[in-house]
Amino acid sequence: MSDKEAFTEHDWRRLLTSLGEDPNRPGLHETPARVAKAWKHWTSGYDQDPVSVLKAFEDGAEQYNELIVVRGIPVYSHCEHHLAPFFGKATVGYLPNGKIVGLSKLTRLVDIFSKRLQVQERMTMQIANALMEVLEPKAVGVVVKCRHMCMESRGIRTQGEETITSCMLGELQPNLALRTEFLALARD
């Protein structure tokens, strides 16, 4: 067990004790280890380089010059303000400029950034900026729609509200027709 896991497991044991629970009782005995493992998974994006997943193909398809859009990409993250989960779907698209990536790479990119403590607005921009930096496409668009448990389970306690963020780079900024096409493809 690494120092990071042991420290985290110890902290979860202390949290249970501070709540008045007995971390050694049957239902909680293994909870600190399980929670430590879960948080390691939920924050594994810090150990991954987004650039490494965006290797361009060289198979002839790089001549494709229309929008490539993947929608319905799962987002599971935790807000950096309360450590509360937020979850939803992302749509990622780009207009290639001689380089394309496998479609699953867009999903992996979203996964890397969502497995960090985040705010949705920054995560949306990070996804778009990474794609723009590595592929140098003519345009990038990212739309993220999530429910935030920090709003639903505490504070205002509203159920089912969704927050939608977007980031448009390159030709999607000035080109209204291209932006409209991307947003139409991004709709559920």
Feature-to-residue mapping (PLM):
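A domain-level signal for the structural core that forms small-molecule/cofactor-binding pockets
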Residues: 1-188
